[in-house]
Design a protein with these regions (language model features):
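Amphipathic protein-protein interaction modules
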Residues: 1-33
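Long, compositionally biased
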Residues: 34-60
């Protein structure tokens, strides 16, 4: 799974971890609805709008 680079960077900043670790965190977050909600909350904490969050949450 490929995640949006900005989303991975936000997770890295939030948890003060490397981008590689942040990628692993994203894998775990996307496994559950509550995890996805946590990612949305992280995006909101960094001032992202609903539209920006939708774009960030799209993965390839």
């Amino acid at each position: 799974v490929k995640f949006n680079k900005e989303l991975v960077q936000l997770v890295a900043n939030k948890f003060e971890v490397s981008k590689d670790d942040a990628y692993s965190y994203c894998v775990l977050f996307f496994r559950t609805e509550s995890g996805i909600n946590n990612l949305i909350d992280i995006c909101k904490q960094y001032g992202k709008s609903e539209k920006e969050i939708e774009g960030l949450m799209e993965n390839e």
